[in-house]
């Protein structure tokens, strides 16, 4: 059986894996400009892996850095929820008549970030997709290493599944996140599967995630490189070693979800740029998802670095539109 994959987007967002996605000539002007902007900001700054996590967090809170705090939404509220004795704080971007719930898990290497730091982005998702957004305030490493973060996110997911109709008048849920948030989303899907609780999870929006704690070639090959990346190899190692402390088996699916049994998973959309050191994580996980008979799509953005969609551009808008189309298709 010969399957011919055709390109499905005129703006160089490849929705199948093609050599053209990795050809430098297909990097758009706005991505070149974005990369130059990132390099100019980072070239004279101290390496991020040399800055303590609490300092990085405060810099972002004060509006500094490349991924700065966003103004609060008037529609946002914090609520403590729980299953049994396990309590978790969630941040809700309310919607009067949502079609579904978007369970969002923020990025930050499991060590920085917060549920209330991207209100404007989450409000836009709520408006564009007609949904209520629930973002999880999970505990951060190194103070709270693995498995604190997935335990908190699992509690939030189970609570949503059990209370979605009563609280939000809809039982449909799409889960998703960026970077560490995509990792946690995949881990939570595996945990929910083990509980037989995947029925109301309609899809997964997995944006430049990390799925193998042993690290994939695209990350490892940059060891010792002096090239400037938004997410460097040294920072990936620092995040990983701060999150997985002690004798943690990095081949476990709960640690590296790429090792999990992905049979029966909901449809997933993977998004990644070819300049991202986590590129192979998305390429490999996309293939694994399909190999287990689960539906998956992928957006590959030529030349884009980690967190590229945090910067306004024509390409970012095109990616957002593709994600919206995917989410609407799975409901």
Regions from the language model: what does each represent?
Residues 1-92, 331:
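A glycine/proline-hinged amphipathic helix-loop "lid/cap" segment
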Residues 4-7, 77-82, 86-91, 95-331:
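Alpha/beta-hydrolase superfamily serine-hydrolase fold, recognizing
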């Amino acid at each position: 059986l010969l399957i011919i994959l055709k390109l499905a987007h005129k703006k160089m967002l490849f929705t199948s894996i093609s050599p053209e996605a990795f050809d430098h000539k297909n990097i758009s002007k706005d991505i070149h400009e974005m990369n130059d902007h990132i390099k100019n900001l980072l070239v004279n700054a101290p390496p991020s892996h040399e800055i303590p996590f609490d300092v990085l967090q405060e810099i972002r809170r004060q509006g500094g850095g490349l991924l700065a705090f966003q103004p609060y939404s008037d529609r946002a509220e914090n609520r403590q929820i729980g299953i049994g004795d396990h309590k978790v704080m969630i941040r809700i971007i309310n919607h009067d008549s949502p079609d579904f719930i978007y369970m969002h898990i923020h990025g930050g290497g499991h060590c920085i970030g917060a549920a209330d730091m991207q209100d404007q982005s989450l409000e836009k998702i709520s408006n564009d997709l007609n949904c209520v957004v629930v973002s999880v305030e999970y505990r951060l490493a190194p103070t709270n290493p693995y498995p604190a973060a997935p335990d908190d996110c699992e509690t939030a997911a189970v609570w949503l599944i059990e209370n979605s109709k009563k609280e939000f008048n809809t039982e449909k849920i799409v889960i998703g996140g960026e970077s560490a948030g995509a990792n946690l989303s995949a881990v939570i899907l595996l945990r929910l599967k083990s509980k037989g609780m995947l029925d109301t999870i309609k899809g997964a929006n997995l944006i430049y995630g990390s799925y193998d704690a042993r690290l994939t070639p695209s990350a490892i090959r940059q060891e010792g490189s002096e090239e400037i990346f938004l997410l460097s190899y040294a920072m990936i190692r620092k995040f990983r070693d701060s999150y997985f402390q002690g004798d943690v088996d990095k081949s476990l699916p709960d640690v590296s979800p790429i090792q999990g049994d992905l049979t029966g998973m909901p449809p997933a959309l993977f998004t990644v740029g070819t300049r991202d050191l986590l590129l192979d994580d998305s390429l490999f996980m996309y293939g694994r998802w399909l190999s287990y008979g689960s539906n998956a799509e992928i957006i590959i953005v030529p030349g884009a670095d980690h967190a590229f969609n945090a910067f306004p551009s024509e390409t970012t808008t095109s990616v957002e539109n593709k994600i919206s189309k995917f989410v609407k298709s799975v409901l």
